[in-house]
């Protein structure tokens, strides 16, 4: 018996030390950060549609809390295994060595303990899933208000946003109350079982003593072991609850983080090679919410050709650009660049060969230099400064100063570039495109945020940028694209007219009507119902 006890003692010491090394050197250090990085990397591969259907704050919360929950799961599981091996197994061996009869109440208690856990733990896990989702929604609403703080202030809706966030906090607390009720009932049941265990084992030990089957010291030793086992039972109860609460959090997080990536490179996808820049839309059909937005669309853009796309709101102009960038899958047809189907090439290589300036420019919350070099991270400072001068941004960048005193190219632009004016953001975006120098250029209202004087100054630079490039320009201000090689007029996802500005005016069709309705150079849009 002594040899058995010594062996158990050394085995416990070895197991506890191994568990401690794993917990402190792996789980507490790099493990959660690696998980966050993997989850973040996974989300970055998701399609635009995935992000359009969720809160940015909610997704951030999922990344953070799921990684922590996985870490806590393994830490708690390790602690539970250590305690079970040290106390329960040791106590069972010792009691069995004294008398196998002492194991009877212990086994009955274990069965009742597992039955209680079987009842409460799945319910705690379900509540934890609801709680994790409620926490993510709460975080998403708070983050949404901060991200759009200018809109909140503009409409004087601070109180409304406060109540909106408070409603999600109430929903979160509802799950907390449910969790606490279940936890309390679980604890009460374990305390009752602990009393049953104490009475059962001590009563059995006393009976053995009265029968002359055990010494009086056995009662004292048994009492000490059972009291320790009772404290272990409470420890196990809380840790089992926490374990399955983390399981619920993990399950909830993986419902979001584990979603299938809709737009993926094919296994045999090759990098896109653009030598000329010819673009062909071949019988393209795209549906959104079961409605064809682009319907059997055919367009051949020659290498180096500059075309303008015109149409009322909802005609499908921006959708064409998103399809060209492979943000969505086509329902039918194909899009070819220099004869290569964009669905057969890698997404990164496709977008590396296309430069885009949109009307709603947002910048990263980083320095001016980092935002400009986002177009070509390996660019030199001289290359960057050259692009800045071409974009007519050199006049205001040296004047920029942030709250920490960083100035010029090192100044932080704020979240989405909120510290800059619309025109300044647009010029930095244009500088970024100059630096990227891609063979295909897309201008989606590229100068809409600029005043007439700056627009006139930058137009010559844009003309220089267009040289030897295939250009697609979308504009509501028709005067900015009237000189394009060809104008494409879209209507309900189809080409209604095409030709030069003069040819379309002579046709007296949709384009001519849009031209006539301009006021001061701006198009009065008519939305398609």
Language-model features: where?
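Short intracellular "coupling" helices and adjacent cytoplasmic loop segments at the cytosolic face
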Residues: 29, 37-67, 141-164, 239, ...
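Transmembrane alpha-helical core residues of multi-pass small-molecule transporters
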Residues: 8, 12, 79, 83, ...
């Amino acid at each position: 018996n002594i040899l058995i006890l010594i062996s158990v003692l050394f085995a416990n010491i070895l197991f506890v030390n191994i568990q401690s090394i794993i917990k402190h050197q792996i789980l507490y250090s790099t493990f959660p950060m690696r998980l966050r990085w993997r989850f973040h990397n996974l989300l970055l591969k998701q399609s635009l549609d995935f992000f359009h259907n969720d809160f940015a704050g909610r997704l951030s919360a999922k990344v953070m809390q799921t990684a922590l929950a996985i870490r806590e799961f393994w830490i708690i599981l390790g602690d539970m295994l250590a305690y079970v091996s040290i106390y329960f197994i040791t106590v069972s061996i010792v009691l069995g060595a004294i008398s196998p009869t002492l194991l009877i109440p212990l086994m009955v208690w274990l069965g009742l303990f597992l039955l209680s856990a079987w009842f409460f733990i799945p319910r705690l896990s379900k509540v934890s899933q609801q709680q994790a989702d409620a926490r993510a929604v709460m975080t998403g609403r708070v983050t949404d208000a901060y991200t759009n703080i200018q809109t909140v202030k503009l409409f004087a809706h601070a109180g409304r946003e406060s109540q909106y966030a408070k409603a999600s906090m109430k929903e979160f607390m509802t799950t907390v109350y449910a969790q606490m009720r279940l936890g309390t009932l679980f604890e009460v049941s374990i305390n009752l079982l602990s009393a049953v265990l104490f009475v059962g084992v001590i009563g059995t030990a006393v009976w053995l003593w009265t029968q002359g089957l055990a010494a009086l010291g056995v009662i004292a030793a048994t009492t000490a072991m059972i009291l320790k086992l009772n404290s272990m039972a409470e420890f196990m109860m809380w840790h089992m609850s926490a374990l399955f609460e983390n399981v619920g959090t993990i399950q909830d997080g993986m419902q979001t983080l584990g979603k299938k990536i809709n737009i993926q490179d094919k296994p045999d996808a090759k990098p896109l090679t653009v030598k000329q820049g010819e673009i062909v839309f071949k019988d393209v059909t795209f549906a959104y919410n079961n409605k064809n937005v682009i319907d059997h669309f055919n367009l051949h853009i020659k290498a180096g050709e500059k075309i303008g796309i015109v149409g009322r709101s909802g005609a499908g102009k921006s959708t064409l650009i998103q399809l060209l960038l492979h943000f969505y899958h086509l329902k039918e047809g194909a899009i070819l660049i220099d004869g290569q189907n964009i669905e057969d090439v890698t997404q990164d290589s496709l977008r590396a060969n296309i430069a885009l300036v949109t009307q709603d420019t947002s910048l990263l919350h980083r320095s001016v230099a980092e935002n400009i070099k986002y177009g070509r991270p390996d660019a030199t400072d001289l290359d960057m400064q050259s692009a800045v001068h071409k974009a007519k941004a050199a006049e205001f960048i040296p004047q920029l100063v942030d709250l920490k005193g960083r100035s010029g190219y090192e100044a932080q632009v704020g979240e989405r570039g909120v510290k800059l004016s619309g025109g300044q953001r647009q010029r930095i975006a244009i500088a970024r495109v100059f630096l990227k120098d891609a063979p295909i250029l897309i201008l989606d209202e590229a100068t809409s945020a600029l005043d007439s004087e700056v627009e006139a100054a930058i137009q010559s630079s844009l003309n220089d940028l267009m040289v030897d490039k295939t250009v697609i320009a979308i504009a509501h201000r028709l005067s900015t694209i009237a000189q394009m090689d060809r104008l494409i007029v879209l209507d309900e996802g189809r080409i209604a007219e095409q030709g030069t500005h003069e040819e379309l005016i002579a046709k007296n069709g949709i384009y001519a009507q849009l031209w006539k309705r301009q006021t001061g150079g701006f198009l009065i849009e008519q939305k398609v119902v």
